[in-house]
């Protein structure tokens, strides 16, 4: 197989259908029921005193439909089983409420049958021996089952305030383990997904093979749960509100309030989040001492969790390790059982429960754990759905014959990413290999004997042939060290109304039908499906039999579910919405625990939206209080509107501008943070450091400078500073009468006079004359702009030729000085059209300066964000040394639309797959591919109307802005 070919996996038909006739065409039970119904209705009809024709017509209208219905069955069940299920539903339908007053008809109990049995058993036993518990545990009554035996101090059992707490089949939570009422131990761990769909074929194969390794050593029964719901943006909103409180500039406060509105809008309409859980139960080993089973279960489950973390890490997944496992498990159950109420944080729910118990005078140390995540009401009176706290649930399952036989890796992404309110539960149960090999051999012999008696024109032939092929496939796999599993899929659909629920169910059926899959509604067994969907690895028996499908280890691994990657850092900035799963992309590039560095490279063709994306990020960083510098070598006017509207400082560096940053100025640096962190260090000469950077400046201005001239220039610069009383002693920088303030700095004109005075440096003076007395004399001034603003734009777009690289160096020199001032403060340097500085037309020393900035800015708590469009020029200088260096030192890359040639050029550098290459060449404006931490995410950039008006460069939109602004300026 070629590296870029995606592998196909096989999910064979069930090789063994017990109780079937005619090669699996009819089920034995259905056939018997059809015969009984046919005789029960047909015999009396045949004895009616009518003509034969009339009796045949009556038979066709009565017996025939019943016989066909019995043969076909209902929802995958026999007619008798369905009728029994229907009457059981009628008998058990009820409304469960918090106060316990609303039961079913005739005053039926609120508890399910298993709970009623447990209650009666407990009443029949000896008086209970109450036990103490931790915060998240409940009392266990004395029972004969020793696996729940504990040795804790006794205390009285507590009746919960919420009657539904008794409905949940959980006894307690201790040591991060769920103790169920049916005497099992269950562990739930949360798994961070990877962006599987945008991985290359080779990477996908690697993930699947690693997942195969895990499945082979995983517990016998595992459940994978994908929970989908509206994103909880409250923590991010709280962060934004705190930043708003600390903001002093009124114009920036307006921007922050606008950002809050945008987040709320996206959160209510589009933002979806997914959480993934791995659930497994304890399987006692033969010979385990029953008296120590609880201790063995806890140790075994904790070991299994660590093993899962190690193996899933090889797949690229991380298993979340909470500080308090009991709290984390309860929070997971809260989000599953109280979907509507879970918009309120779990700690608020805990406070509410504690307040209720205190108000009722109850002991808060004896609160049953189920109180913290029990819903307030469950309506079980409908056959096709149930209602929990006003939210409607419907359950679907994929029947045994509803699976595709050949599937790609990660095919469950279709269901995982289906949309808001669509949850998926995957159940895998490994079967004993010896027993399955024996059954396979028996069934193969039976099927081979049947097919010999069947004509190849018979409808049974294909079914038998498929069963035989499936049997041989499974047998070969088992002989090649694969394991045998039964796979079950249960789909949860939730909606705010019955109409929405029915629409979602219909759409899910269409979606699966389009993929050649079948799905059935769990009619009249919604309660069983609801309990099965809990993370307890407990699929109800009837649902299990209806939906089980045999798979080998490779087929089970193709169901790899952790495929919907999200980037949502509460302390970050919004970039947009994930195009594949509608999750919000909120990135905190300064979080060193997640990102090795904060650098970003933005690549795109002309008109793809590079400048728009760059400015959007800059505005949102400024909104967070981060120091922002923008260097604009082209079209600097595009940055002016946003800068002036948020209180920024716009500095134009050009011969025609009055603004000037003195290139020879030694700026005062705040070393207090360095002294606090590292202690007082050896003093370094600020003059020597400045002169070293000035040498780079003059090498840009005079590329053909000889070594002798460079030495003479060095002497002249030292002399120039000496005239101002500045030496290598840093104390000489300060004014004697005003300590803490620096002396007046020399300007280029002072250096020019010294160079012009010597014949040996006359040539250097003549070249420098352009910046002193010529057309570019604006460079020959003291700094006359405020350099302490939080948002500074350095416009060098009016510089051309050699002055462009000179101006770029002036800008970089300034921002580099500012970046070094405080290592603990976050700052971001944006360089638009970076190819101008490191491209073929640039100078190696200038390119080295940018590359050095990219390599070292991390050490000063900063970020370098480079945007470029001319990729050929970007990778031109020194065979792409500088372009590749910047790309390699940027942990995050944002790819906008690229032309075919540019995309192929960047494919090798970024290791893009063919699918990703195709995607970025077809991006529309506003779409991007974010590549970070080995995950590639297609995102739709989102901005508010205010942000769009501040940074748009589109001609039509600018014309509309000008039209709206005209009446304000000319009211008459």
Where in the sequence are the language-model features?
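Short, charged cytosolic
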Residues: 1-14
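A short helix-turn-beta junction within AAA+ P-loop NTPase domains corresponding to the substrate/partner-engaging
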Residues: 647-650, 881-895
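Conserved P-loop NTPase
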Residues: 912-966
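P-loop NTPase motor domains
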Residues: 167, 172, 177-178, 183, ...
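Extended, folded cores of ATP/NTP-driven motor/assembly subunits in large transport
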Residues: 59-561
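Hydrophobic alpha-helical transmembrane segments
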Residues: 49-64, 595
């Amino acid at each position: 197989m070629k590296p870029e070919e995606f592998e196909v996996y096989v999910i064979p038909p069930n090789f063994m259908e017990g109780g079937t006739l005619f090669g699996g065409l009819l089920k034995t039970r259905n056939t018997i029921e059809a015969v009984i119904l046919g005789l029960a209705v047909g015999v009396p009809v045949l004895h009616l005193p009518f003509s034969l024709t009339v009796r045949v017509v009556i038979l066709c209208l009565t017996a025939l439909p019943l016989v066909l219905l019995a043969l076909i069955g209902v929802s995958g069940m026999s007619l008798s089983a369905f009728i029994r299920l229907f009457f059981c539903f009628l008998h058990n339908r009820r409304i469960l409420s918090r106060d316990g007053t609303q039961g079913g008809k005739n005053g039926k109990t609120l508890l399910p049958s298993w709970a009623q049995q447990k209650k009666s058993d407990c009443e029949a036993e000896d008086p209970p021996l109450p036990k103490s518990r931790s915060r998240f545990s409940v009392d266990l009554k004395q029972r004969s089952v020793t696996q729940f035996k504990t040795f804790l101090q006794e205390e009285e059992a507590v009746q919960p305030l919420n009657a539904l707490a008794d409905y949940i089949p959980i006894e307690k939570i201790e040591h991060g383990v769920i103790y169920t009422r049916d005497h099992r131990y269950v562990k739930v761990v949360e798994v961070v997904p990877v962006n599987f769909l945008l991985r290359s074929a080779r990477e996908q194969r690697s993930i699947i093979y690693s997942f195969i390794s895990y499945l082979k050593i995983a517990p016998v029964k595992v459940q994978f749960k994908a929970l989908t719901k509206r994103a909880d943006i409250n923590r991010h909103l709280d962060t934004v509100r705190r930043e708003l409180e600390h903001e002093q500039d009124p114009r920036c406060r307006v921007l922050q309030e606008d950002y809050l509105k945008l987040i709320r809008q996206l959160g209510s309409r589009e933002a979806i989040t997914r959480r993934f859980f791995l659930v497994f139960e304890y399987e006692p080993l033969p010979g385990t001492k029953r008296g120590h089973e609880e201790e063995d279960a806890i140790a075994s489950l904790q070991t299994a969790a660590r093993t899962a973390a190690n193996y899933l890490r090889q797949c690229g997944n991380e298993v979340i390790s909470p500080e308090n496992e009991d709290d984390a498990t309860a929070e997971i159950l809260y989000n599953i059982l109280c979907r509507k109420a879970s918009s309120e944080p779990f700690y608020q729910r805990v406070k509410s429960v504690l307040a209720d118990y205190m108000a009722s005078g109850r002991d808060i140390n004896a609160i049953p754990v189920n109180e913290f995540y029990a819903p307030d009401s469950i309506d079980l009176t409908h056959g096709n759905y149930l209602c929990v706290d006003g939210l409607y649930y419907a359950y679907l399952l994929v029947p045994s014959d509803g699976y595709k036989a050949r599937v790609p890796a990660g095919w469950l992404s279709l269901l995982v990413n289906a949309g808001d309110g669509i949850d998926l539960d995957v159940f895998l149960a490994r079967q004993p290999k010896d027993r399955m090999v024996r059954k396979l051999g028996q069934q193969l012999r039976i099927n081979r004997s049947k097919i010999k008696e069947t004509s190849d024109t018979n409808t049974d032939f294909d079914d038998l042939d498929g069963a035989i092929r499936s049997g041989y496939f499974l047998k070969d796999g088992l002989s090649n060290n694969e394991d045998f599993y039964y796979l079950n899929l249960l789909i949860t659909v939730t909606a705010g109304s019955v109409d929405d629920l029915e629409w979602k169910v219909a759409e899910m059926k269409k979606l699966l039908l389009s993929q050649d899959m079948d799905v059935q509604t769990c009619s009249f067994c919604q309660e069983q499906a609801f309990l099965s969907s809990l993370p307890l690895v407990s699929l109800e028996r009837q649902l299990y039999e209806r939906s089980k499908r045999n798979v080998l280890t490779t087929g089970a691994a193709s169901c790899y579910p952790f495929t919907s990657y999200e980037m949502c850092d509460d302390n970050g900035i919004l970039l947009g919405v994930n195009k594949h799963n509608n999750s919000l992309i909120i990135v905190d590039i300064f979080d060193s625990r997640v990102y090795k560095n904060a650098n970003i490279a933005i690549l795109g063709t002309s008109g793809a939206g590079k400048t728009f994306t760059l400015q959007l990020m800059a505005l949102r960083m400024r909104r967070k209080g981060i120091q922002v510098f923008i260097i604009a070598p082209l079209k600097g006017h595009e940055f002016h509107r946003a800068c002036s509207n948020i209180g920024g400082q716009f500095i134009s560096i050009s011969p025609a501008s009055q603004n000037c940053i003195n290139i020879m100025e030694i700026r005062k640096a705040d070393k207090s943070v360095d002294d606090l962190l590292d202690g007082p260090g050896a003093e370094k000469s600020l003059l020597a450091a400045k002169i070293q950077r000035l040498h780079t400046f003059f090498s840009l201005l005079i590329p053909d400078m000889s070594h002798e001239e460079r030495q003479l220039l060095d002497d002249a610069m030292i002399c120039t500073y000496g005239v101002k009383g500045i030496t290598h002693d840093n104390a000489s920088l300060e004014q004697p009468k005003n300590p803490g303030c620096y002396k007046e700095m020399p300007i280029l004109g002072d250096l020019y006079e010294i160079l012009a005075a010597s014949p040996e440096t006359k040539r250097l003076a003549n070249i420098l004359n352009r910046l002193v007395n010529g057309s570019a004399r604006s460079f020959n001034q003291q700094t006359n702009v405020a350099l302490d603003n939080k948002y500074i734009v350095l416009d060098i777009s009016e510089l051309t030729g050699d002055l462009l690289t000179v101006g770029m160096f002036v800008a970089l020199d300034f921002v580099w000085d500012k970046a070094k001032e405080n290592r603990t403060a976050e700052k971001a340097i944006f360089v638009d059209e970076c190819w101008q500085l490191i491209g073929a037309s640039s100078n190696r020393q200038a390119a080295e300066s940018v590359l050095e900035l990219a390599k070292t800015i991390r050490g000063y708590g900063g970020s370098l964000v480079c945007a470029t469009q001319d990729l050929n020029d970007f990778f031109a200088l020194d065979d792409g040394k500088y372009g590749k260096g910047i790309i390699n030192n940027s942990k995050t890359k944002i790819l906008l639309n690229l032309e075919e040639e540019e995309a192929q050029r960047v494919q090798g550098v970024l290791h893009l797959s063919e699918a990703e290459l195709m995607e970025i060449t077809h991006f529309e404006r506003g779409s991007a591919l974010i590549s970070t931490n080995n995950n590639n995410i297609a995102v739709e950039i989102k901005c508010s109307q205010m942000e769009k008006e501040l940074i748009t460069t589109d001609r039509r939109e600018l014309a509309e802005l000008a039209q709206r602004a005209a009446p304000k300026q000319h009211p008459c």
